[in-house]
Amino acid sequence: MYTYLMLTMRTEKFNQEHVAGHYEFLDRLQAEKRLKMFGPFSDATGGAYVIEADSLEEAAEIGHADPLVASGSSELTIKEWKLKK
């Protein structure tokens, strides 16, 4: 498993109605033990979450299933994160 930082930044099309679905999406990732941490940015421009996945392709598939991203409300950037322990 690899660790990925998932950055979701609001777009001009941001719609608050998709936020509840976003949190349900994160709850599912947490139940699957993939989600390590998450939270919004203090300036309300978006947020980030950290997941574990087998590949960048799998991380992208997961990230594009996020209702905020799928709706166009947020733009997704994914970075593999080589955490030091």
From Swiss-Prot:
Superkingdom field: Bacteria
Pfam families: YCII
InterPro entries: Dimeric_a/b-barrel, YCII
SUPFAM superfamilies (alphabetical): Dimeric alpha+beta barrel (SSF54909)
Signal sequence coordinates: none
Stated family: Belongs to the YciI family.
Protein name: Uncharacterized protein YjpA
Lineage of producing organism: Bacteria, Bacillati, Bacillota, Bacilli, Bacillales
Gene: yjpA
